[in-house]
Amino acid sequence: MALLLELAHGLPWLYFSLVFLFSLMIGSFLNVVIHRLPIMLEREWQAEYRSYFNPDDEGVDEPPYNLMVPRSCCPHCNHPITALENIPLLSWLWLRGRCRGCQAPISARYPLVELLTALLSVAVAMTLAPGWGTLAALLLTWVLVALTFIDLDKMLLPDQLTLPLLWGGLLFNLLGGFVSLGDAVIGAMAGYLVLWSLYWAFKLLTGKEGMGYGDFKLLAALGAWLGWQALPIVLLLSSLVGAFMGIGLILLRNHHQSKPIPFGPYLAIAGWIALLWGDSITRWYLTNFL
């Protein structure tokens, strides 16, 4: 930590460069999490289903599948991805977005996640003073990136990410983080109850589900990290971003009105903005409108 402080004050360009490069590698790992975690959960659910409803069915012995095993490979030709082909961002550019084995296109989202993770991390490093708070904010940022893309893909916010994020926020603030422990606990409770109440009010009025329970847990986690004071701005920003994005998708005819839109990404975006600039936005609003 002392070395980071010296770099940040003496050689800020080197400090930000190291944050960028390290976060590119984190983004590469997040791609693995985004792709594999839903598959791991699906396999787990299938195994639980068999154990409850078909206890005599032993199923098929499947090879291990987790975040480390098996080795990453091309989904089209099973060409194993070598170390040189797995350099964040650069490998995709070097391969021109195609598999070295079969020349099948590689989704541009892989380098996008890596670059987005790196840029958001640099923004955190430039906005917050170097210290444990910056490291905690980086961790929060990385988990929010993973949750955003999983929800976009699968309409799912896994408990395996939201619950550790919630407890991590409480623990961080217990140790003297962004807010007091009392504010963090109230933030977690209020975050969950607000969306839970909206969910049931909407369901009673329309008979439809407006959001999932993962959204409750994500807002609770943001409340645990940022305190209850940040919840109004998180809800306001997420609603505004969600409304603009939803209207834009409908106008572009890329989205049918009856098709659900994941709310988790908008909560994640709003939570990240509140993390860095929530106090400034609140002061600006109070100064100009109240």
From Swiss-Prot:
Task: Give the subcellular location.
Answer: Cell inner membrane
Task: Indicate the principal place this protein occupies in or around the cell.
Answer: membrane
TM segment ranges: 14-34, 106-126, 130-150, 161-181, 185-205, 232-252, 261-281
Cofactor annotation comment = Zinc is required for the N-terminal methylation of the mature pilin, but not for signal peptide cleavage.
Record's bilayer topology term: Multi-pass membrane protein
Domain of life, source organism: Bacteria
Q: From its record, what is one biological process in GO terms?
A: methylation
Q: Do the record's keywords include Endoplasmic reticulum?
A: no
Cross-referenced InterPro entries = Peptidase_A24A_bac, Prepilin_IV_endopep_pep, Prepilin_pept_A24_N, Prepilin_peptidase/N-MTase
Keywords of the record: Cell inner membrane, Cell membrane, Hydrolase, Membrane, Metal-binding, Methyltransferase, Multifunctional enzyme, Protease, S-adenosyl-L-methionine, Transferase, Transmembrane, Transmembrane helix, Zinc
- Record field: catalytic activity: Typically cleaves a -Gly-|-Phe- bond to release an N-terminal, basic peptide of 5-8 residues from type IV prepilin, and then N-methylates the new N-terminal amino group, the methyl donor being S-adenosyl-L-methionine
| Known EC number | 3.4.23.43, 2.1.1.-
**Which GO molecular function annotations are given, in alphabetical order?**
aspartic-type endopeptidase activity; metal ion binding; methyltransferase activity
Q: Which GO terms describe its cellular component?
A: plasma membrane
What is the required cofactor set for this protein? Zn(2+)
Q: Which PANTHER family match?
A: PREPILIN LEADER PEPTIDASE_N-METHYLTRANSFERASE-RELATED, TYPE 4 PREPILIN-LIKE PROTEINS LEADER PEPTIDE-PROCESSING ENZYME
Entry function = Plays an essential role in type IV pili and type II pseudopili formation by proteolytically removing the leader sequence from substrate proteins and subsequently monomethylating the alpha-amino group of the newly exposed N-terminal phenylalanine.
> What family does the entry list?
Belongs to the peptidase A24 family.
Protein name as annotated? Prepilin leader peptidase/N-methyltransferase
Taxonomy of the source species = Bacteria, Pseudomonadati, Pseudomonadota, Gammaproteobacteria, Aeromonadales
Q: Which gene encodes it?
A: tapD
